[in-house]
Design a protein with these regions (language model features):
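Non-membrane alpha-helical segments in proteins
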Residues: 68-70
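Residue-level "edge-of-site" marker
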Residues: 31, 102, 122, 252
Length: 275
């Protein structure tokens, strides 16, 4: 068995694995995961066959994020997962590393030095749509501000990633009260099932709820999925007020230290595969 960098074809296979695990990735997520650190996208190959994957994406000199950690079911219980993890940790070096660990594997992450910070709890539903004069679509002049808001809430440098995330067919809504400065935003993207929302950044609960309802108004009849950041004590209440019900949960974990983030402004994670 060898560990090597993914090709674009490999990444397409891995994203299908992620869908098969019930993670419901965005339909174009693979394109974006290749932006920050292609060398960190790794697969395990045995006799020419892909048997496992991991992504260890380096976001600048101080932070990396691990995701897409999958071993094909018929190869579980052996050394594939451990070899992938060790290769990924070597790629990250001494950076703080974040990951979202599935609940049944927390002990494995702890054995690698990760410690839990809070839950990311997926909530799903079709919120009652409502437009709000304080919420508007992203304008060209908003991009730098929105990228800056995201940068404040992420422990590494993903500005290039975020500029791409705001482009294309993703739906973006901005919180700009009284037509003034943008102080919050939410991004929705088509997923295998419904639409995923993330990141969701807002100055308070009312703004977070208004952004999601405005996104719902632009996506009539669609089911929306939000990975609620429970480190923000008001976030679950907002999801409940939106009529969304809890489902899949994972633990945000860190290795080599825990970054200090403005969790009170963070309502929904961008993507569990890249932070």
């Amino acid at each position: 068995m060898r560990i090597r960098q993914m090709t674009s074809d490999d990444l397409a296979v891995v994203m299908r694995w992620a869908a098969g695990e019930g993670w419901n990735p965005g339909t174009r997520d693979g394109e974006f995961l290749a932006i920050p650190d292609p060398a960190g996208l790794l697969v395990a190959e045995k006799a020419g066959d892909l048997v496992g994957s991991i992504g260890m994406l380096r976001f600048g000199a101080r932070f990396a994020f691990a995701g897409l950690y999958i071993v094909r079911p018929d190869h579980r219980g052996g050394t594939t997962g451990a070899r992938l993890a060790l290769a990924a940790l070597e790629h990250a070096g001494d950076r703080i590393i974040g990951t979202d660990g599935v609940l049944e594997r927390i002990a494995d992450y702890e054995a690698l030095g990760f410690r839990g910070a809070h839950l990311h709890h997926r909530h799903s539903g079709a919120p009652t749509p409502a437009t709000d004069p304080r919420v508007r679509p992203l304008a060209h002049g908003d991009v730098d501000v929105v990228v800056g808001l995201d940068d404040d809430c992420f422990p590494g440098d993903r500005r290039g990633f975020m500029r791409a995330w705001l482009d294309g067919d993703h739906l973006v809504r901005c919180w700009a009260p009284d037509g003034g400065q943008v102080t919050g935003f939410g991004v929705a993207r088509r997923a295998v099932a419904g639409w995923r929302i993330g990141p969701l950044v807002a100055p308070h609960a009312g703004a977070a709820e208004a952004i999601v309802r405005d996104l719902a108004a632009a996506l009539p009849g669609e089911e929306l999925h939000l990975d609620v950041i429970t480190g923000n004590p008001e976030a679950v209440a907002v999801a409940t007020a939106l009529g969304m019900t809890p489902g899949f949960a994972c633990v945000r974990m860190y290795r080599n230290g825990t970054p200090q983030l403005p969790l009170a402004r963070m309502w929904g994670a961008c993507t569990l595969e890249a932070g």
